[in-house]
Amino acid sequence: MPSLWDRFSSSSTSSSPSSLPRTPTPDRPPRSAWGSATREEGFDRSTSLESSDCESLDSSNSGFGPEEDTAYLDGVSLPDFELLSDPEDEHLCANLMQLLQESLAQARLGSRRPARLLMPSQLVSQVGKELLRLAYSEPCGLRGALLDVCVEQGKSCHSVGQLALDPSLVPTFQLTLVLRLDSRLWPKIQGLFSSANSPFLPGFSQSLTLSTGFRVIKKKLYSSEQLLIEEC
């Protein structure tokens, strides 16, 4: 009994090739060339799609045109973004600003009597942000900072104190914060800057509000780099 394959073979051989009508075939490149062209066309389409998708996502995320996007990114530095995701340094900075205000409240600017120096809320915020920014690139962050506090009035600069967030840690960099007294208060505070021979009068003379302007000098204690001075 013939098998199914034998039947198929006999039926196909019985039909003469010459009896079948020939259909004209148009000239076309070989299959390999056609496949290569198809792959290249598909790759070009996918590349175009990916590029347009990225451009669409970028423009929808920023909300600006190409020129506005470039200007926006130029105005934003990497530390500004990283500060938002660093709760430890933000917490340390809040503690440092509290210590700073307490030190200023007991400051002694002259030999006669101490003065209570007050930081406006705007000054507290600006100083905190600047200290965080300067500590961003340090190996221990703000924990490795040694902060010297000075108050400037005219050509004189009076030291208030030195603060360290973590006394058990060897400082990696030093920050000198130079605060300023409002020049309009000078007639009221001239008595605070008397000579050393003047008698000391106990008690606080008055509360003085500091100016919102300040200067920060950064010095790396493990490097010979030049001093970095930030004027705000």
Swiss-Prot record:
Residues 1-71 are annotated as: Disordered. Broadly expressed, with lowest levels in brain, skeletal muscle and intestine. Up-regulated in substantia nigra neurons from Parkinson disease patients (at protein level). Residues 9-22 have a biased composition (Low complexity). Changing R133A: No effect on inhibition of mTORC1. Its main location: mitochondrion. Phosphorylated by GSK3B; this promotes proteasomal degradation. Changing T25A: Strongly inhibits proteasomal degradation. GO terms for cellular component: cytoplasm; cytosol; mitochondrion. GO terms for biological process: apoptotic process; brain development; cellular response to dexamethasone stimulus; defense response to virus; intracellular signal transduction; intrinsic apoptotic signaling pathway in response to DNA damage by p53 class mediator; negative regulation of glycolytic process; negative regulation of TOR signaling. It is found in: Mitochondrion; Cytoplasm, Cytosol. GO terms for molecular function: 14-3-3 protein binding. Changing S137 to A/D: No effect on inhibition of mTORC1. Regulates cell growth, proliferation and survival via inhibition of the activity of the mammalian target of rapamycin complex 1 (mTORC1). Inhibition of mTORC1 is mediated by a pathway that involves DDIT4/REDD1, AKT1, the TSC1-TSC2 complex and the GTPase RHEB. Plays an important role in responses to cellular energy levels and cellular stress, including responses to hypoxia and DNA damage. Regulates p53/TP53-mediated apoptosis in response to DNA damage via its effect on mTORC1 activity. Monomer. Interacts with BTRC. Identified in a complex with CUL4A, DDB1 and BTRC. Interacts with TXNIP; this inhibits the proteasomal degradation of DDIT4. Belongs to the DDIT4 family. This is DNA damage-inducible transcript 4 protein. The lineage of its organism: Eukaryota, Metazoa, Chordata, Craniata, Vertebrata.
